Every structure is written in C-alpha cells, then in structure tokens.
Amino acid sequence: MDDSFLTARDFASHPAYVYPGYGSSVKRGPTRPLIPLKEKLRDQRVPVYGTEDLGALDHDLTRNAMRNGEPLGERIIVTGRVLDEGGRPVRNTLVEIWQANAAGRYVHKNDQHDAPLDPNFLGAGRCLTDNEGRYHFLTIKPGAYPWGNHPNAWRPNHIHFSLFGEHFGSRLVTQMYFPGDPLLAFDPIFQGTPEHARDRMIAGFSLDTTQEAYALGYDFDIVMRGRNETPMER
C-alpha cells in the first residue's frame, strides 16, 4: 500500500462504545480509558484466500442450504465494491455475511422467539472480491425481529458483514440496512452511529442490479477506513 494515501481512522463516524439507549453496550462497553496496543507483525499480514477455499454456492444463500425446495421470502441481490481510503479496490478479500430469515429468525440456539425456521435457509454466506473490489450475494430479504432492548423493540431489516480488508488488523464488522425502513428511527444500534455517517450503512436500491422477474437489487459499497469509511458495529 502507498503510505501517501493512508489517513487516520475517522472515529467520529463510528458509534460510541457506550450508547445509553443500547442496553448491551452499557453492559459490555469499556468505562476506562483504552490502552493502545503495539501493532504486531501478525496484524500486518494479508489473509490469503483462494477460490479453492470457497464452495461454489457459498455466495448464494438461496441455494447453499437447500434441502427440499427454495427458501421462502423475497429474493434480493446484494452487491457492491470494497474500497480503501483512497477509493481503490480491495481485491481478493473475504466478505462474509449472516442474517435472519424472511420471518426474522436466525439459525442459532439462542434465537427462540416465536417465528418459524426455514429448512432451506441457513442465513450465512461468503465470497471473495474480484479485481474491481466487487462482491456479489443472492439471498432472501431478512425480516424484522423483536429483541427486548426496550418495550416493543424491533430490529430493522439488516444484514451483518465481516471483511478482513488488506490485513488482519483492518477487519471491519458492520451492518447493512435497507432504504425507507420505518424501524430505523427507533433502533438504538443504528441511531447510535453519528448522524452524518448513518447513510453509509444504508444500501441503495438499484434497478440496474435488479434481475428482471427474479430478484430486486441493492448496491452497498464498503470503505475500509478514512474520511468516508463505513461505520463499524459496536
């Protein structure tokens, strides 16, 4: 990487470690000054993944857990570019996603709320970015779900993202939301992000990405660091 393009991480664009409206952050967020850790060689190493490390259907959540039919719900295409602070593509980096199903339930032992599981949907996928830094997923639009943070609390439709970027020390975990979701105004996880940076977590509907008579398309670019970096998940 050309050091002339490096910029400081914009901490003012990220959620605070402790946000009063978000109960879990109050319980687990640090309350004492942070201690800087000296960067180690292992933090600077580039994670290497090849196509042989991924399954042919890892990017297609509508088929990678299929048992006896297609999963229920609205099919969507989610695509975008992973960029560094200079706007250059981050190539061959691993992008992982996980999400609830169309009914708003995760395949996880701790998710026991009253919504059905889909036997044909796992809710997890991964892919590598191409030479333009682009990733591509086919999935089902996730449903909203109750989460008990406050009375009548519901999480907006969202997809979790994990990216390693150019080295292990640059890993980013964030969430992607959908345009026009009325629950965004009431969600303390989304609202905990500074207002000027919230739009960076909302995908844009794209008719160009939409596949006719099959799936709606959403574009979601991710910037790993710098002045326009995508806010991280706390």
Predicted features along the sequence, with ranges:
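Beta-strand-dominated extracellular/periplasmic modules and repeats
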Residues: 1-234
